[in-house]
């Protein structure tokens, strides 16, 4: 597993969760024979239904101020996961959202 990729995705997902959380962020790391899972969830407002499918598109952001956030974070996370044979999964929870990154083992 390329830990540079994992670190980049980790930092981005945590940064996003902190930005949108009301007060709580959960981070879970799991590994098995298939690979490595990184899940980050928050208790923010989650993704609206029409946004959920667009969240990993390049340059997509809900924020009106594009000077700080260019809408590339989740897109880059998705590309890094896919480059490593994995995926990025985004879902809404009863409160907030959860993003799971999977990196396939290269063994």
What are these regions (language model features)?
Residues 24-34:
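Short beta-strand/loop element within the Bergerat-fold HATPase_c
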Residues 80-81:
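Detector for a conserved hydrophobic position within an alpha-helical segment of the HATPase_c
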Residues 23, 85-86:
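Conserved glycine-rich
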Residues 73-77:
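Short alpha-helical Gxxx[C/S/T] motif in the catalytic ATP-binding
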Residues 42:
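Acidic ATP/Mg2+-coordinating residue in the GHKL
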Residues 11-12, 16:
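Conserved polar catalytic motif of the HATPase_c/GHKL fold
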Residues 47-60:
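Short conserved segment of the HATPase_c
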Residues 1:
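Conserved micro-motifs of the catalytic ATP-binding
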């Amino acid at each position: 597993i390329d830990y540079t990729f994992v670190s980049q995705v980790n930092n981005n997902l945590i940064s996003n969760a902190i930005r949108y959380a009301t007060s709580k962020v959960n981070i879970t790391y799991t590994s098995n024979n298939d690979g490595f899972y990184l899940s980050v969830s928050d208790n923010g407002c989650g993704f609206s239904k029409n946004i959920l499918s667009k969240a990993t598109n390049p340059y997509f952001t809900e924020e009106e101020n594009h000077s700080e956030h260019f809408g590339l974070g989740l897109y880059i996370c998705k590309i890094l996961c896919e480059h490593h044979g994995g995926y990025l999964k985004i879902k809404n929870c009863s409160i907030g959202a959860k993003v799971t990154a999977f990196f396939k083992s290269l063994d």
